[in-house]
Amino acid sequence: MTQQSNPNEQTVELNRTILYWGLLLIFVLAVLFSNYFFN
């Protein structure tokens, strides 16, 4: 049971980190594009 739950928890943490990095990247790109258009 523990051998199956540990990889699942790791994949969930990996997916969460990828999701957070993706949102951060989108936010940074949105700020850069907004600055480019306003300037």
UniProtKB/Swiss-Prot annotation:
GO terms for cellular component: photosystem II reaction center; plastid membrane; thylakoid membrane. Keywords: Membrane, Photosynthesis, Photosystem II, Plastid, Reaction center, Transmembrane, Transmembrane helix. It holds the Pfam family PsbL. It is found in: Plastid membrane. The chain crosses the membrane at residues 18-38. It is a single-pass membrane protein. GO terms for biological process: photosynthesis. The keyword Iron does not apply. The keyword Plastid applies. InterPro entries: PSII_PsbL, PSII_PsbL_sf. One of the components of the core complex of photosystem II (PSII). PSII is a light-driven water:plastoquinone oxidoreductase that uses light energy to abstract electrons from H(2)O, generating O(2) and a proton gradient subsequently used for ATP formation. It consists of a core antenna complex that captures photons, and an electron transfer chain that converts photonic excitation into a charge separation. This subunit is found at the monomer-monomer interface and is required for correct PSII assembly and/or dimerization. PSII is composed of 1 copy each of membrane proteins PsbA, PsbB, PsbC, PsbD, PsbE, PsbF, PsbH, PsbI, PsbJ, PsbK, PsbL, PsbM, PsbT, PsbX, PsbY, PsbZ, Psb30/Ycf12, at least 3 peripheral proteins of the oxygen-evolving complex and a large number of cofactors. It forms dimeric complexes. HAMAP family: PSII_PsbL. Belongs to the PsbL family. This is Photosystem II reaction center protein L. It comes from Cuscuta pentagona.
